[in-house]
Amino acid sequence: MDGTTAPVTKSGAAKLVKRNFLEALKSNDFGKLKAILIQRQIDVDTVFEVEDENMVLASYKQGYWLPSYKLKSSWATGLHLSVLFGHVECLLVLLDHNATINCRPNGKTPLHVACEMANVDCVKILCDRGAKLNCYSLSGHTALHFCTTPSSILCAKQLVWRGANVNMKTNNQDEETPLHTAAHFGLSELVAFYVEHGAIVDSVNAHMETPLAIAAYWALRFKEQEYSTEHHLVCRMLLDYKAEVNARDDDFKSPLHKAAWNCDHVLMHMMLEAGAEANLMDINGCAAIQYVLKVTSVRPAAQPEICYQLLLNHGAARIYPPQFHKVIQACHSCPKAIEVVVNAYEHIRWNTKWRRAIPDDDLEKYWDFYHSLFTVCCNSPRTLMHLSRCAIRRTLHNRCHRAIPLLSLPLSLKKYLLLEPEGIIY
């Protein structure tokens, strides 16, 4: 037995070839890869199990549950791995040996992976070799739906130029078009490109949401509590493309409701100027002003006083007076917002609920304001100047924002009529 080696079994030899094949793919050793395929030591469509913690290679049906350890690896062919690593030479070798170009061992074709990796060279090669442009992944997405980053815009353009359907909806419970996806991720260049190539601006998903509504909702980065200028630009573009500003989803929410939920005064101004109706109600009977009221306390980056001012100047119905304590509950740390709302009434009288709604530290911090609030909101009528303001605003109603700036009045009076906060009530 000494000096001899154990014979290599057939299964052992197959494992060795498979390992060499995988190493050649990873190192982009296309010469070695070609030699293995010429010798027919392994099938060109051999499936490997590889690490894939970010699920670039995998795609699963919505609603399916898998344990976490199952999601850390995926099945993939040599084509998928070549695209994943960006190894164009290996990709060409495999295609020259008739690799199955639309294979989906773990739910995605190589073209899906190429778009997710934003590798435009691989996209071009796969398209040239006959990859199906509108093929669904197991999760119901086409290649265009995987173009979700600025670096993948060129991939999307290649697909559309070669005939990909810009209005094809996902084959899942969301039913979103590529335009919805571009709006979701704030890709203004891609939004413009899709519309120029026939995308329906007011296409709706399964929840009856338009791309404008999607962009308005995702304009707030919830984790960072920051507003996205990219999404603002997308909304501006969609409105310029004549998107319906008062479109309603299946909960009767308009894009203005979405912007109000984010307390996003930039988008609210944009939509109101484009003709959004300030008093549209959702399925629960809430208008945009109620949405702002609900979220004011949890939007640290917001300027709620501007949101209220915009809505009231565009004819929004005022908060029901007996519920005014809820305004104070939501805005106790933002006196300017309370000032804007309270000045929309000819007169309103305070009650004990108002005082209970103000934390002691905020009462002390903003004492001058709250002292003026309780002094003015008593049994005595407001000043003649305030009552004149209310009369003018009542006459102009939803034209306040447009008509008041045109009046022959000093700027300070125009600001007063438009409910510009001053930090104190008189």
Curated annotation (Swiss-Prot):
One Gene Ontology cellular component: Cul5-RING ubiquitin ligase complex
Recorded coiled-coil stretches: none
GO BP term, pick one: protein autoubiquitination
Pfam families tied to this protein: Ank (PF00023), Ank_2 (PF12796), Ank_4 (PF13637), SOCS_box (PF07525)
GO molecular function: ubiquitin protein ligase activity; ubiquitin protein ligase binding; ubiquitin-protein transferase activity
UniProtKB keywords: ANK repeat, Cytoplasm, Hydroxylation, Repeat, Ubl conjugation pathway
Domain SOCS box: 371-423
Residues modified to (3S)-3-hydroxyasparagine: N246
CDD domains membership: SOCS_ASB4_ASB18 (cd03723)
Region (Essential for interaction with HIF1AN): 238-239, 244-246
Known partners and oligomeric status: Interacts with HIF1AN. Component of an ECS (Elongin BC-CUL2/5-SOCS-box protein) E3 ubiquitin-protein ligase complex formed of CUL2 or CUL5, Elongin BC (ELOB and ELOC), RBX1 and ASB4. Interacts with IRS4. Interacts with ID2.
Function: Probable substrate-recognition component of a SCF-like ECS (Elongin-Cullin-SOCS-box protein) E3 ubiquitin-protein ligase complex which mediates the ubiquitination and subsequent proteasomal degradation of target proteins. Promotes differentiation and maturation of the vascular lineage by an oxygen-dependent mechanism. Also acts as a negative regulator of GPS1, a component of the COP9 signalosome (CSN) multiprotein complex, thereby inhibiting the serine phosphorylation of IRS1.
Family affiliation: Belongs to the ankyrin SOCS box (ASB) family.
Domain-level remarks: The SOCS box domain mediates the interaction with the Elongin BC complex, an adapter module in different E3 ubiquitin-protein ligase complexes.
Name of the protein: Ankyrin repeat and SOCS box protein 4
Lineage: Eukaryota, Metazoa, Chordata, Craniata, Vertebrata
